[in-house]
Amino acid sequence: MPKIVVVGAVAGGATCASQIRRLDKESDIIIFEKDRDMSFANCALPYVIGEVVEDRRYALAYTPEEFYDRKQITVKTYHEVIAINDERQTVSVLNRKTNEQFEESYDKLILSPGASANSLGFESDITFTLRNLEDTDAIDQFIKANQVDKVLVVGAGYVSLEVLENLYERGLHPTLIHRSDKINKLMDADMNQPILDELDKREIPYRLNEEINAINGNEITFKSGKVEHYDMIIEGVGTHPNSKFIESSNIKLDRKGFIPVNDKFETNVPNIYAIGDIATSHYRHVDLPASVPLAWGAHRAASIVAEQIAGNDTIEFKGFLGNNIVKFFDYTFASVGVKPNELKQFDYKMVEVTQGAHANYYPGNSPLHLRVYYDTSNRQILRAAAVGKEGADKRIDVLSMAMMNQLTVDELTEFEVAYAPPYSHPKDLINMIGYKAK
């Protein structure tokens, strides 16, 4: 009976194991998870903190016991894989509760250890990061136990923005700082102004080009010279792949610690796959490498690996498009395609339109800003971005499908919109992009 070992039990690992079991009823499947919880919804965590998700249990799909009862898959939490011997096809495992170590053999090894939150490195009892359900519980319990009011949020990426919004909605008083003036880097810089407008509208303090110099109890000294007091600090300063344990093996890592994979999510070592935040692959629509540590990619990779292990040799990954979205108070920010800083590798043109998300005479209309970049050599779409209170998600998803099928910007005129006054225009913003490009 083949033995399949999975490292990591969240989006990629748990999904892959589940899909393998759906296709293969016989194999022995074991998942090692270094932390307390398995199969939780990472993207739900800020909303648990904000009490938008009313019960944290809604963010937890399975316990190990439930997973075994439903799928006959063994999940061992607090078990950290600390080394791989790919020549003997074994992994070394540390039981973090007992501090005991043991070896586990495998026929197939699936690596989905995810990433960990970066830290600024200050020794402080009021400083937290958010990466898993344990972090979420710690933040929630600290807020309740210490009657937290003033919270400093460090960083201005997706997670920090979501955390700040949810702290505000919970009734706390957050302040945002960021070390540069470049916020929300997945979005075009000049399309981020509504973020600052939303902060100003709610009188939420923020400072760009600001950093922490020192923390002394609740007293924070900043690079600017300001000294302020906060009850709590939440750091959202990026992540790094959990790949240290892989260095002992023959598995190739890139300079940032990610694992390059082929179109089957195979590593350079036979019988070892890598999926989720740790894997780096390529874009679908252009010839560039891509690392897209988001939920869709982890789930797609899980299905592809499961199909292969079950015997489907023809299935392949065709690449990322990098579709991403975030809600910040009343606005939605969405984009798809290459990152803004990757556009310089192409000879491109940009076309954009700003108009109401639906018919102007229908109540509740608000402006939607849609922008498309296309390659001048073949007029295919490289990147699209949208910002507005309504309809950004729909337009970016349509453009994602257009890019998946390598449509040109001119072909957007042929997009047949589902039109009624509450939803769109007879000539949608997507159509208008095509017309303007001509």
UniProtKB/Swiss-Prot annotation:
How are cofactors bound according to the entry's free-text note?
Answer: Binds 1 FAD per subunit.
Listed transmembrane segments: none
| Keywords from the named record | FAD, Flavoprotein, NADP, Oxidoreductase, Redox-active center
Q: Which GO terms describe its molecular function?
A: CoA-disulfide reductase (NADPH) activity; flavin adenine dinucleotide binding; NADP binding; protein disulfide isomerase activity
Please tell me where FAD binds in this chain: 8-33, 267-277, 419
User: InterPro entries annotated for this entry?
Assistant: CoA_disulphide_reductase, CoA_disulphide_reductase_staph, FAD-bd_OxRdtase, FAD/NAD-bd_sf, FAD/NAD-binding_dom, FAD/NAD-linked_Rdtase_dimer_sf, Pyr_nucl-diS_OxRdtase_dimer
Q: Which cofactors go with this protein?
A: FAD
Q: Per its UniProt entry, what is the enzyme's top EC class, as one word?
A: oxidoreductase
- List its EC numbers: 1.8.1.14
Which reactions is this enzyme annotated as catalysing?
NADP(+) + 2 CoA = CoA-disulfide + NADPH + H(+)
Which Pfam family, giving just one, matches this sequence? Pyr_redox_2
Active site (record annotation): C43 (nucleophile), C43 (redox-active)
> Which residues bind substrate per the record?
T15, Q19, R22, S39, N42, K71, H299, K427
Gene3D superfamilies, sorted: 3.30.390.30, FAD/NAD(P)-binding domain
Q: Where does NADP(+) bind?
A: 151-166
The UniProt entry, under HAMAP family, shows:
CoA_diS_reduct
Q: What else is noted?
A: Reduction of disulfides occurs by a thiol-disulfide exchange reaction, but involves only a single catalytic cysteine residue that forms a stable mixed disulfide with CoA during catalysis.
What does the protein in this record do? Answer: Catalyzes specifically the NADPH-dependent reduction of coenzyme A disulfide.
Complexes and interactors:
Homodimer.
Its family remark reads:
Belongs to the class-III pyridine nucleotide-disulfide oxidoreductase family.
Query: Could you give the domain comment from the record?
Result: Contains 2 FAD binding domains and a single NADPH binding domain.
* This protein's name: Coenzyme A disulfide reductase
Organism of provenance? Staphylococcus aureus (strain COL)
Gene name as annotated: cdr
